[in-house]
Amino acid sequence: MKETKQEEMEVREDCESVDSNLEATVEEMESTKGTSEDLEQKLAEKTAQYEDIFSQFQRLQADFTNYKKRVEKEKGDIYLYANEKIALDLLNIIDNFERAIQSTEKTEENDSLLQGISLVYKQLLDTLTKHGVEEIEAMEKPFDMNLHYAVMQEESEGASNYVIDVLQKGYKIKDRILRPAMVKVSK
């Protein structure tokens, strides 16, 4: 009997040990369960934060790419239209050359002077053409408010809204208008 009591005691101790281990395991599982839920919540928060930062990064990258393209275009435009201001100033000189040629053509005196003025005028026009300045064709063309500046209207036998006289030539550099042509338009 002693042995059975001793065995019984050992069994009880083992049971108590198992019970305490079981309780500790249950407590650990419950605490881990709470921690697991916390970890899942933190993971979801970090994932949302990452997606937000990644989205901001993509927008910033697109903005930078657009900025680089815009700067390259502006640099190209600077080179294309660098002569625009000086060409605009030279247009008044061209107008004066044209007036001088017209006034000397009426008088037959100073034929050599007329030739000299004509040569300088042609050279100036050639230089401007070489740098992209072109005359706007206006005579007998349909009136275009982007290219022409109508200062007069006159009854005409032809179609209406056509340029019938050019009072001052217009010029453009590449695709930009330096000065619109001042014209008379048919009614």
From Swiss-Prot:
<keyword id="KW-0963">Cytoplasm</keyword>
<comment type="function">
    <text>Participates actively in the response to hyperosmotic and heat shock by preventing the aggregation of stress-denatured proteins, in association with DnaK and GrpE. It is the nucleotide exchange factor for DnaK and may function as a thermosensor. Unfolded proteins bind initially to DnaJ; upon interaction with the DnaJ-bound protein, DnaK hydrolyzes its bound ATP, resulting in the formation of a stable complex. GrpE releases ADP from DnaK; ATP binding to DnaK triggers the release of the substrate protein, thus completing the reaction cycle.</text>
</comment>
<dbReference type="GO" id="GO:0000774">
    <property type="term" value="F:adenyl-nucleotide exchange factor activity"/>
</dbReference>
<dbReference type="GO" id="GO:0005737">
    <property type="term" value="C:cytoplasm"/>
</dbReference>
<dbReference type="GO" id="GO:0051082">
    <property type="term" value="F:unfolded protein binding"/>
</dbReference>
<comment type="similarity">
    <text>Belongs to the GrpE family.</text>
</comment>
<keyword id="KW-0346">Stress response</keyword>
<dbReference type="InterPro" id="IPR009012">
    <property type="entry name" value="GrpE_head"/>
</dbReference>
<dbReference type="Pfam" id="PF01025">
    <property type="entry name" value="GrpE"/>
</dbReference>
<dbReference type="InterPro" id="IPR013805">
    <property type="entry name" value="GrpE_coiled_coil"/>
</dbReference>
<feature type="compositionally biased region" description="Basic and acidic residues">
    <location>
        <begin position="1"/>
        <end position="15"/>
    </location>
</feature>
<dbReference type="GO" id="GO:0051087">
    <property type="term" value="F:protein-folding chaperone binding"/>
</dbReference>
<keyword id="KW-0143">Chaperone</keyword>
<protein>
    <recommendedName>
        <fullName>Protein GrpE</fullName>
    </recommendedName>
</protein>
<dbReference type="GO" id="GO:0006457">
    <property type="term" value="P:protein folding"/>
</dbReference>
<dbReference type="InterPro" id="IPR000740">
    <property type="entry name" value="GrpE"/>
</dbReference>
<feature type="region of interest" description="Disordered">
    <location>
        <begin position="1"/>
        <end position="40"/>
    </location>
</feature>
<comment type="subunit">
    <text>Homodimer.</text>
</comment>
<dbReference type="GO" id="GO:0042803">
    <property type="term" value="F:protein homodimerization activity"/>
</dbReference>
